[in-house]
From Swiss-Prot:
The active site is at 59 (nucleophile). Keywords: Autocatalytic cleavage, Cytoplasm, Hydrolase, Protease, Proteasome, Threonine protease, Zymogen. This is Proteasome subunit beta. The lineage of its organism: Bacteria, Bacillati, Actinomycetota, Actinomycetes, Acidothermales. It comes from the Bacteria. InterPro entries: Ntn_hydrolases_N, Pept_T1A_subB, Proteasome_sua/b, Proteasome_suB-type, PSB_actinobac. It is an enzyme of class 3 (hydrolase). Its EC number is 3.4.25.1. The formation of the proteasomal ATPase ARC-20S proteasome complex, likely via the docking of the C-termini of ARC into the intersubunit pockets in the alpha-rings, may trigger opening of the gate for substrate entry. Interconversion between the open-gate and close-gate conformations leads to a dynamic regulation of the 20S proteasome proteolysis activity. One of its GO terms (cellular component) is proteasome core complex, beta-subunit complex. Belongs to the peptidase T1B family. It comes from Acidothermus cellulolyticus (strain ATCC 43068 / DSM 8971 / 11B). Residues 1-58 form a propeptide. CDD domains: proteasome_protease_HslV (cd01906).
Amino acid sequence: MTTSGGLTGPGAFGRLPQPFHQPGITSFVEFLALQAPDLLPGRLQMPAGGQPPEVPHGTTIVAVAYQGGVVMAGDRRATMGNVIAQRDIEKVFQTDEHSCVGIAGSAGIALEVVRLFQVELEHYEKLQGTTLSLEGKANRLAMMIRANLPMALQGLAVVPLFAGYDLFADDPQRAGRIFSFDVTGGRYEEHSFHAVGSGSTFARGALKKLFRDDFDEPHAVRTCIEALYDAADDDSATGGPDLTRRIYPVVAVVDANGFRRLADDTVGGVVEQVIAARMANPGGPVAVLP
């Protein structure tokens, strides 16, 4: 008896096809490229001379390292040209127990890349019995972004921000690490803080003035929200806190205990503090000169 999957013999029904039994491939993306390349992100091609379609774009993501971990936050707005496509999109996601990723760029493709990246890390852990190092995870994500280059050249780019807690760091106080990428798959480690997306210029300016080496988690969370507020103040594609709809930034913390997304009530309390302070000083906090 021969099944549609190419298996023969009694009991063949319900068994995995032969390609799933090949040893040596720890990368799910590599396996998919060999067996079903049409399922990978970036497989679509536009006609020559065609214009990229109007698609929702994620905007601003920020990350701040503090003593013992890292905080990542993202606004909730997606834009499509000059239109607000969505007011409550989520752009910060857990990728495994000790890392997270934030997305900017073409939202649909970025979300597909994130889901595939989550499967990639889980696949490796199940086959190897251990997790990739933080740098190994960043390298895998860079490889996936590089595979999307044909779409990026056609106007559908994905630019994520990756952060996590390095379980193998020599100094646990410096274990929070941040990695940025370009559309070609270039991977760069950032120090202390970073921002990506349309409002990143304004967010990085705020982070540069507010960051301190002795930050703890509450200070890092407050600084991320201040930076997103400044980005929304100057960039129309970045959404500020929406108190009437109770839509607040997504804020995630990664430390030695793992990934943790802050509850909306917690983030809302910090947002209210930021807005109350801005009522007295619309420009926000200023750096203290020596």
